[in-house]
Amino acid sequence: MDYAFLGIVAAVLLGSITSLWTVRVQATHRLSLDSLWVLVQWYLTMLLGFAMIYMILQVNGHAVFTPSPNSASKDRLSLLEDSLYLSGMTLLSVGYGDVTPIGVGRWIAIAEALVGYIMPAVIVTRTVFDWDHR
């Protein structure tokens, strides 16, 4: 069941990534609040999606990150918090503190960091090309 949910999360992430090239933002200015809102929604989708991937794998016995030593307990809520923290630090390229990826989690973190780097470039490129076509 958990692996089926992992597949659903991966499909949603891929759908979100491909929507960048298909969804048109109607804006009257080069950079608008609509463009910013799309960027924020996309980052939140990626952050939550990758956090779910980390958590599902961790719950199923695949060590993908080192849990925070500051966690009072090792329940699922603490695991969710650590997964969200790891995902946010990776996606926004802030850097790691007490939670770091290990094993296959390192490869997932590389993919997430790449997505985090490419996203602003895609938004700027789409904005420029859309503006030129008007």
Swiss-Prot record:
InterPro entries: K_chnl_dom. This is Protein LctB.
